[in-house]
């Protein structure tokens, strides 16, 4: 179908495939307490408790988690040289940090928070249902040969452009499950190869991400031994991501940074289908309430959240519906249609969306590496632009005025959530750097 987007200050730039900032007109205070949402504050707390219960098993399965007692967590990195390079040195930019999920253990991306959580939760539930784990028994039993042998009769499947597939595949194989990852035509060869080395079956589809997910779902529906991790509809994925907000809150507290009405918090979250950024944003709203403002970032040709939310439609709108191509080097964000689940949750909770051009992503990737040795994928580098749009763009200044925060910006804290990069092979990363040099 063809969709005509309503009048909006960002519309023409969006349709022309140029970088811009869209401010969500439906954004409102206390939206998290809306009664008809499919998730609640209580669900975020339950997810935190689930992570704690699973931690001993995670430490047993992944040696890199021994020192953290099974916690999957990333550093909060203060911008120093990179802050100068990005032009964020003046007072109006307040505090600026990278939340380095690009260097998360186990899977090397933010998807470790969702994919690992859902697979390990499925394993626990399956074991309890089949008498392999009783009440009060040590969850580390699930890493033993008896459980692994049982799990080998089941397959965990997922549709992915790359990083979720890595996360789910790594988690499933660690427990003894078979694993199948349906990948779109946008998937990078190194991610396909890494999965196959782990013994994961990779099925590549000629079509885009949405089609890969639909194919994976159809196959799983026909086989009771296949568990499908549904990136479009999964509450488990969403809530796995949401627990990251409590980790961030603790890190800010350790640094003596207060978040309240006078000291706002801004999150800049790269977005594909929306589960990871939506989950993190929801978790942050559960903790910080109206004092946190979450912005998604999407490629100029794949702004699926932006076009759907700008349209105001109850039916999901695709980037193809407005004449965009869904072609981008940021493979983790090459998604034509956002999750309906995330759209419902974030409709009134998302502050806005900004877009980035591929050439700029490569420049930012190189800048992050040269200045602070932050190894990022192009999609992760998109987070670095957030404060620029909020402070310098006309719509960003209008947002500040509407929220009554212009005078508070020097006391604000900006979190640039870098979502992946540490697992990129050195040869591929050098190619990224060469591409950055080529575009100037």
UniProtKB/Swiss-Prot annotation:
Sites bearing N6-(pyridoxal phosphate)lysine, chain numbering: 111
Cofactor: pyridoxal 5'-phosphate
Keyword Glycoprotein applies: no
GO molecular function, one term: pyridoxal phosphate binding
SUPFAM superfamilies: Tryptophan synthase beta subunit-like PLP-dependent enzymes
Enzyme Commission code: 4.3.1.18
Pfam families: PALP (PF00291)
Keyword tags: Lyase, Pyridoxal phosphate
GO BP terms, alphabetized: D-serine catabolic process; isoleucine biosynthetic process
Reactions catalysed, as given in the entry: D-serine = pyruvate + NH4(+)
Gene3D superfamilies associated with the record: 3.40.50.1100
Family in the record: Belongs to the serine/threonine dehydratase family. DsdA subfamily.
NCBIfam families named in the record: D_Ser_am_lyase, PRK02991.1
HAMAP family membership: D_Ser_dehydrat (MF_01030)
Name used for this protein in its record: Probable D-serine dehydratase
Species annotation: Rhizobium leguminosarum bv. trifolii (strain WSM2304)
